[in-house]
Swiss-Prot record:
Signal peptide positions on this chain: 1-18
Keyword annotations of the record: Cell outer membrane, Conjugation, Lipoprotein, Membrane, Palmitate, Plasmid, Signal
Lipidation, S-diacylglycerol cysteine type: C19
Recorded GO CC terms: cell outer membrane
Lineage: Bacteria, Pseudomonadati, Pseudomonadota, Gammaproteobacteria, Enterobacterales
Domain of life per record: Bacteria
Primary gene name: traV
Pfam assignment, any one: TraV
Role played: Involved in F pilus assembly. Appears to facilitate the polymerization of inner membrane-located pilin subunits into extracellular F pilus filaments.
Protein name: Protein TraV
Subcellular location: Cell outer membrane
UniProt keyword Membrane, yes or no: yes
Length: 171
């Protein structure tokens, strides 16, 4: 028991020592296209870019489309029909006779008459009628913006006519 109580704080100290960093600030692992900066420097850089471009020139031009086949519907193939000259012609020979159709089963059958049962349909109270909303979909093609960011194809749905309660119907 005494040995266990000694090793637990020692083990905890060793674990915390491994997590402790040698510097007070985080190190920057910048790649060739990135630079390290503090949050204040990044905010200042963003403010400068925002001030310099009062009118956004990108909004006037369309972004370039991404490469690839992004069809949502399969390509409809056209089937070729054979010309009428290649079809075999049907010829009737004068010596061939067509047979009249004959019944397959000639046994006597019992005919039953069915008398319909008159029934009164129960009257149900009128039910309220709810019409569903009508929506339209807008497909947005994939594109790459001016900062070379790829945007995937997506769909945006709009409500054209909202749902509403109609006059009750009687069944």
């Amino acid at each position: 028991m005494k040995q266990t109580s000694f090793f637990i704080p020692l083990l905890g100290t060793l674990l915390l020592y491994g997590c402790a960093g040698t510097s007070t600030e985080f190190e920057c692992n910048a790649t060739t296209s990135d630079t390290c900066m503090t949050m204040e420097q990044a905010n200042e850089k963003a403010k400068k870019l925002e001030r310099s471009s009062e009118a956004k020139p990108v909004a006037a031009s369309l972004p370039r489309l991404a490469e690839g086949n992004f069809r949502t519907m399969p390509v409809q193939t056209v089937t070729a029909t054979t010309p009428s000259g290649s079809r075999p012609a049907v010829t009737a020979h004068p010596e061939q006779k067509l047979l009249a159709p004959r019944p397959l089963f000639t046994a006597a059958r019992e005919v039953k008459t069915v008398v319909p049962v008159s029934s009164v349909t129960p009257v149900t109270p009128p039910r309220p009628l709810r019409t569903g909303e009508q929506t339209a979909a807008l497909w947005i093609a994939p594109y790459i913006d001016n900062q070379d960011v790829y945007h995937q194809p997506s769909s945006v749905f709009f409500v054209i006519k909202p749902s509403a309660w109609g006059k009750p119907r009687i069944n």
